[in-house]
Amino acid sequence: MLNFIEGGVCAAQGFRAAGIHVGVKTHAAWKKDVALIVSDVDCAAAAVFTKNVVKAAPIHVDKAHLADGKARAIIANSGNANACAPHGEENAEKMCAAAAKAIGCKPEDIVVSSTGVIGQTINVQVIEEGVPALYAALERSNEASDAAAHAIMTTDTVKKEVAVETTVGGKTVRMGGIAKGSGMIHPNMGTMLCFLTTDCAISPEMIKTALLETVGVTFNRISVDGDTSTNDTCCVLANGLAGNETITAKGPDYDAFLTALRALCTALAQKMAADGEGAKHLITCTVSGAADEATAETVAKSVISSTLTKAAIFGADANWGRVLCAMGYSGAAFDPEKVDVHFASAAGDIAVCAKGRGLDFDEALTKKILTEHDVEILITMGEGSATCTCWGCDITYDYIKINGDYRT
């Protein structure tokens, strides 16, 4: 049985968290800007990173630190990306060293992340000086996870925090996560930080496999604005304190773990898509009847990434032609004359296109459907049985305002 629970990254046994203001965000002393997540014991660890060729300094450091598949803690700051700036890797290593000193572990056992403005030298001194207070603030509580979630926010308007509980090998296993992401989010990961914790016992090899299988069908299926960031990191720590037999191969226990991990990451991905900068609507695009899953995914990603489709949803305009247009330039091979399109929400479900041709439909009802916060675009391709769901958001005037003065 899989259940959603409270606790975020502190839901699993043996994890503590904290988030405080140290001064990275010089313009907002009331905003937390450094987070720390610590396990009481060493963890199996894995991470996936941005596919952008331009990578932030912490990513290079993390790849080296995670080469052995182990970690003890995560330190992350907001307000500065530590990307394309002098002494980037040196400063990232200094953050790791400061955290390691407080915790009592090796710097190589620390994962480091940053998010914020690109191209400015990070003030690592205020982070180093703030780590003792950050460490002292560590707790295993809902409030501590909440503080860490707030400390990694940039243009986010709400925290992203989820936890789940399941059974693996007869033992209760918990996992939780916090994430940030509101702009520069696009399939294949984009300005998104996501930190996951679990007390499941699982080998480094299998947790890496599970993370890769999960990211592909969750975070890589969201889009806010089509920009892929320099800093994306999704990292998972597993400390084994649940007491289950260590998962070392695929089987029933692995399947149970994977199901929970996917549920956790799907919920976090949806929260990020819904909190797109200035967004008023969460758009869920489900493609069914595709020849294969790759085709379904290509089409769904194209639709949620379409600026014109986003604008239509913002205006509650049932311009289904923009959906077909986005499908057509997606690169997927399909027959447009087999395509059906519906719009749906809590207000109802209405067919607007059948076999590639427009239908007469109730404009007033459609307007009502598209005015709801959660809007679905349902596409049937009529060529097979494969399906895929992707998530995005509308684009509003506020998106321009937020990004027009981001550095201020």
Predicted region positions:
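A structural signal for small-residue-enriched, beta-sheet-centric alpha/beta enzyme cores
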Residues: 1-90, 94, 100-408
